[in-house]
């Protein structure tokens, strides 16, 4: 039933895209050569690295939320769908809120997303003893990180120049790397005996790692602007 439900949502999404998106003019100046030149763009690669590292914490927690709740919190297996729904709700609301702040200042919005996400993991690790606080913490984890994807996508469009298509596709690849890397680190630490909360602490480190890379991107950008003057 889960697959049929997912397929139904996918079909409704296709219908919404067909009737809801405005028609856009094709960019006839786009070319494969221009796209490939984007591979030399340092800012594009650094921004992609922010997503590949900074978003990994969510996947570290999401991949092991079921055993964390059942083995550490000692919750019933029946609550897992509600926990996942709580995470999904946080992603929806968080994306809307982050978009509002991005309209005011994109770079500051990305910084605050990563900082607040790191704090949410700390709160989550300290809140998993009780089911109610665990649900709240899981919501905050997804709420705080939800905006990172679209915010980085927007920044990529700003720095990619004529390689817009390449940047957009690589952004998805970066988040797939985050998916694999976060889940791997969380699982590896559990296998090494660091306990069920280890994936949550991985989230703290990865969010801060993404923040450090972002600050490096800003510094590199300032140097590039100064060099052009």
Regions found by a protein language model. Give the residues of each.
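A membrane-interface helix-boundary motif in multi-pass transporters
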Residues: 1-8, 76, 188-208
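C-terminal transmembrane helical hairpin of 12-TM major facilitator-type secondary transporters
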Residues: 106-152
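C-terminal membrane-cytosol helix-exit motif in multi-pass small-molecule transporters
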Residues: 2, 7-27, 213-217
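Extracytoplasmic gate region of multi-pass secondary transporters
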Residues: 43-85, 89-92, 106
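Multi-pass alpha-helical transporter architecture, strongest
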Residues: 17-18, 201-229
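Helix-to-loop junctions at the C-terminal end of transmembrane segments
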Residues: 93-106, 190-191
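Juxtamembrane intracellular "pre-TM" segments in multi-pass secondary transporters
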Residues: 20-50
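A late C-terminal transmembrane helix in Major Facilitator Superfamily
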Residues: 158-196, 200-203
